[in-house]
Amino acid sequence: MWTVRTEGGHFPLHSPTFSWRNVAFLLLLSLALEWTSAMLTKKIKHKPGLCPKERLTCTTELPDSCNTDFDCKEYQKCCFFACQKKCMDPFQEPCMLPVRHGNCNHEAQRWHFDFKNYRCTPFKYRGCEGNANNFLNEDACRTACMLIVKDGQCPLFPFTERKECPPSCHSDIDCPQTDKCCESRCGFVCARAWTVKKGFCPRKPLLCTKIDKPKCLQDEECPLVEKCCSHCGLKCMDPRR
């Protein structure tokens, strides 16, 4: 007589405590749970946020450091940028990140964009970690980053209160043609630029606790070389050197 071994001993197959129906039910339940788990994984395969657009024409792709968003720590996403997949902060402009040398023993010359001085600079990359402000050569760095601040000035978006909305752009390079990434009542949006004086406005603060009433609408309303800049409200400011 056939029996089934359990922790408590043996049950005959014709025993009332054993049933092929029970086996079939458990098998179907297991398959259903696996299918549900697979569907949930498929639905939740992306973390919030948008990856930056690829800015280079890639003739050779570099080895990927991730395959999906969940290969990346915390809120980072797996993005294709500078000819390879890498973990990136979807809420920061890559070319504005500080230089990161990495923490392995290998050394190779790479290039990063020095946003403060507005130029591409070489550095020694140690091969692990780091960030997305990391390019194989100077040409790639310049192509990816030199247009992150386009000529022109953001137009006025009159508002007394600001809502925190997901940004539709992170920097000017995310916007088509001559449009700029501008502060609006609801996050940052691409907008047609105004004609401006030479120089660039100081960097915008990450967060404004209060939006001041506009002191100007465009550069022509500011004295001498001052520019009309968006800095928690429009105001005349000395251009960034």
From Swiss-Prot:
Record GO terms (molecular function): serine-type endopeptidase inhibitor activity
SMART domains given in the database record: KU, WAP
Compartments reported by the entry: Secreted
UniProt tissue specificity: Expressed ubiquitously, the highest levels are found in the epididymis followed by testis and trachea.
Leader peptide range in chain numbering: 1-38
GO CC terms in record: extracellular region
Pfam families associated with the record: Kunitz_BPTI (PF00014), WAP (PF00095)
Main location: secreted
Start and end residues of each BPTI/Kunitz inhibitor domain: 95-145
Keyword Transit peptide recorded: no
Segments forming domain WAP: 44-91, 147-194, 195-240
Disulfide cross-links: C51-C79, C58-C83, C66-C78, C72-C87, C95-C145, C104-C128, C120-C141, C154-C182, C165-C186, C169-C181, C175-C190, C201-C229, C208-C232, C216-C228, C222-C236
Superkingdom to which the source organism belongs: Eukaryota
PROSITE patterns for this protein: BPTI_KUNITZ_1 (PS00280), BPTI_KUNITZ_2 (PS50279), WAP (PS51390)
Alphabetic keyword roster: Disulfide bond, Protease inhibitor, Repeat, Secreted, Serine protease inhibitor, Signal
PANTHER family found in the cross-reference section: WAP FOUR-DISULFIDE CORE DOMAIN PROTEIN 8 (PTHR47769:SF1)
Protein name as annotated: WAP four-disulfide core domain protein 8
Organism listed in the record: Homo sapiens
Gene name of the record: WFDC8
